[in-house]
């Protein structure tokens, strides 16, 4: 997967984006700690920002397996797919 420049979507440079496919981008959060609902809410805001620039863009999250069930539910309800990768 190719890295995408976050500034193209008016996002801070610390946000890591990867192109998964044409019209499909992934937000990368490979951290050791668990992703909680507060983190998921921030991911939803990033996804909305990406889709405000390119409405046809599908957004997914690339993360480790440490993600809480409430976060998974929130992401699923917002149409954000989850791709599990190991650290």
Locate predicted features.
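Short, compact, well-ordered microdomains
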Residues: 57-87
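Active-site metal-binding core of divalent-cation-utilizing nuclease and nuclease-like domains
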Residues: 1-20, 38-39
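Histidine-anchored nucleotide/phosphate-binding helix
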Residues: 41-49
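Generic preference for hydrophobic/aromatic residues in regular secondary structure cores
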Residues: 11-21, 27, 77-85
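Hydrophobic beta-strand segments of well-ordered beta-sheets in folded domains
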Residues: 23-26, 55-61
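Arginine/glycine-rich "motif VI" loop of SF2 helicases in the C-terminal RecA-like domain
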Residues: 48-56
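Glycine-rich phosphate-binding "P-loop"
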Residues: 23-42
């Amino acid at each position: 997967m190719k890295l995408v420049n976050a500034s193209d979507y008016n996002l801070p440079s610390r946000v890591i984006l990867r192109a998964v496919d044409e019209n499909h981008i992934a937000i990368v959060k490979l951290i050791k700690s668990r992703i909680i609902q507060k983190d998921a809410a921030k991911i939803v805001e990033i996804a909305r920002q990406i889709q405000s620039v390119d409405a046809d863009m599908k957004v997914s999250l690339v993360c480790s397996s440490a993600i809480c069930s409430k976060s998974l539910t929130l992401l699923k309800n917002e149409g954000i797919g989850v791709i599990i990768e190991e650290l």
